Structure formats: C-alpha cells, structure tokens
C-alpha cells in the first residue's frame, strides 16, 4: 500500500502537467477514460458484487441502490465523462481586462486550483464524475471513498488510470487513498501544502467533521433538508405531481424533499389525496409506501406517526416524509429559515406576489416556484456532471461545475512602468 504522504508527493509532482494542459489534450484523456471505464465493466461489476455482499443487511435498501452498479449504470458514468468533453474549457478564460492611466494592462484570468481532495461516501458514480470534472478544470485529484464502496471505487480508478496511460497526461493526476480509516480522512483535512481544496460529499456527520477539523480550504456540500410549501393559492394537481416527484423519484439524494408544509386552507383537500397517492396507490403498485411524520394539525387529515421535533431537522434519505400544516406563507418561510440546510426549497402557488415573497425571503442555494426540487443538479442546470451542491456562499453556491473548481489570477502587462 502506498502511504498517504507518498500519494500527496506523487500528485504534487505531476500536477503541473494537468494544470497547464491544453483543452485538446484534456479532452483526449477524458475520452480514453470513458472508453476504458466501459471496457472494464466486467471487473467493475465483480468488485461491486463484493461490496454489495458485504454491505447487505448493514445499510438500507435505498443506500444499497446508491452502491449498486450494472452495465447500464457504468455506461451512464462513461456518458457523463463524455459530456464533460463537450463543455467549454474554463482554464485561460479572460474574466476582465482593464487599462490603467499609466498604461498597465490588467487581465483577470481563470486558472486551476491545483490539487483537489474529495472525501465521499458509498456512491461509485462520484468517482468518475470527480475525476472528469477535476481533469477538465485542470486539477489533479485525491479521492477517498467510503469503506462500503472501496472495491468498486478501486476498480473504477484502475480503469480511469489505464485510460490516462494511453495519453500524455500522467495517471498520477488521479490518486485513490487506499486506507479507508478515519485517520486517512483526517490526514486529508490537515494536508495543507498538498491539497489546495477539500470537498466532502456525504451525510451530515462527514460534512461536519470536515468543516470543523480541516485546515485545508473547504467547500461545504451541505445535507438536504429540502422543503416544499403548498400555498393557499396552489394548483392541487400541480402540487401533487411536484410532491410525488420530489419525494419518490429518488429519495436517497440530497435534492429529494424531506419536509412538506401545507397551508391550512389546503390541508383538508390535499392531504387525503396525498395519502392516496403516496401510500395506497404505491402499495397497490407493489412500491414502498411513504411513511408520514405528522404534526398535530396534519394528523387530522391523514394517518401516520406523530412527528417528533427532530423529524423536521432530519435528512431521511428514505421513504419518510415530515408534514406540517402552517397558517400562512410567513409561517412557512419562518419554518424553512429555522430548519433548512439552505440547499433547495420550493413553493407551489398561482399567486405571483406569494412566489416573489418566497424567492426573496428563502435563503437557499436553489429556490423553486412550481417545480420539483429534484432539478438541483449540475446536469439539469446545464453544467454537466457536478462535484456536489454547495450550500455555502463563499466561492461557490449551488451545483458545482467546472468553473466552480477554478480560481483566477491577475496578469499585469507593462512597458517598463515603475511605481512612484
């Protein structure tokens, strides 16, 4: 096993080769990575079977689905890499140019960060997405996956590096930390001078540990306590469709709805319909029904478990939904501000003034009017695959694509000027 220190030194030794690589060279490397990923399908699936067998019974079915790979999912991962090829290269982009009275020309140019560390949990697709985005944005990457997905991740990284071996980019620009202990995560948090940026992707425990302990600069990809508010002026059919999609299309992801707020004028009519759609109809279709966590008012209209205080502060990532009835738009916004992780929140309303108030007052990375929160995604936003959803305000906010993985520098051109 290569030591962490050796890996940090290896990636530092080759980072310049990717930091300054041309768009053509990077695109050739990405295509080779995608091709070798598909070519290694058999090996990746064998590794994934080992991870699945070890994880079964230890994590939920929803989380198992995150871990699971088949040939179609591997092809989708390769397709995601190829989509990055089509995106404009951000490196070298001139952001601003100005000329001073003394003749100095100041140009602000986009540049690579350098080496980016990614600590993430059991999601194999993050491996290929992270490798593709960091490479296209001119960065080397150090990956540290969760223990549950290590065999799969190792097989994926092996395939990606074999692809790079056929190009002029050194394979060491992608590094996988082989030690999955907590110590390896903490070592990355303290790797100042080796990592220029650290991005955690996972649950609240992982993210909080990185934010609280890292001395390396961090972009926080927050958890998603995502709200949908059904206003008194909502179209109920539209609301039900949005709720169904936001909660059930993929409950294990961070942009899935966790809390439903319903105006008291709508509760008596929409909550029984919601119960029919999310419980009865799903049971009839052989699908897992939604389990409700209800406040006292919501429980008058639908059956379910009484909500505890913590239910409105929980990212369930499962077929569980907290429901609260509110008396006004203002109460809904106040609740969101008290409980939201500032990821994605939505209002369903036909009232333009209510929509404007909601979008002005709710301080989240993505705020929706009459649309599912499931659109908070780099691909859906036209950014290509993403590095994560940033819930902080400095440097990057919302889906992080290529530009969010860059910095800038000033190039000052003169003709012998000196400062007097």
Curated annotation (Swiss-Prot):
Entry superkingdom: Bacteria
Coiled coil: none
Enzyme kind, highest EC tier: oxidoreductase
Pathway involvement of the protein, from the record: Amino-acid biosynthesis; L-proline biosynthesis; L-glutamate 5-semialdehyde from L-glutamate: step 2/2
SUPFAM superfamilies referenced in this protein's UniProt entry, alphabetically: ALDH-like
UniProt keyword list: Amino-acid biosynthesis, Cytoplasm, NADP, Oxidoreductase, Proline biosynthesis
CC per GO annotation: cytoplasm
InterPro entries: Ald_DH/histidinol_DH, Ald_DH_C, Ald_DH_N, Aldehyde_DH_dom, G-glutamylP_reductase_CS, Glu-5-SA_DH, GPR_dom
Subcellular localization, as worded in the UniProt entry: Cytoplasm
GO biological process, one term: L-proline biosynthetic process
Assigned EC number: 1.2.1.41
Catalytic activity from the UniProt record: L-glutamate 5-semialdehyde + phosphate + NADP(+) = L-glutamyl 5-phosphate + NADPH + H(+)
CDD domains per UniProt: ALDH_F18-19_ProA-GPR
Principal subcellular localisation of the protein: cytoplasm
Gene3D superfamilies (alphabetical): Aldehyde Dehydrogenase, Chain A, domain 1, Aldehyde Dehydrogenase, Chain A, domain 2
Keyword set includes Metal-binding: no
Function of the molecule: Catalyzes the NADPH-dependent reduction of L-glutamate 5-phosphate into L-glutamate 5-semialdehyde and phosphate. The product spontaneously undergoes cyclization to form 1-pyrroline-5-carboxylate.
PANTHER family with a match to the protein in the record: DELTA-1-PYRROLINE-5-CARBOXYLATE SYNTHASE, GLUTAMATE SEMIALDEHYDE DEHYDROGENASE
Similarity-based family: Belongs to the gamma-glutamyl phosphate reductase family.
The name this protein goes by in its record: Gamma-glutamyl phosphate reductase
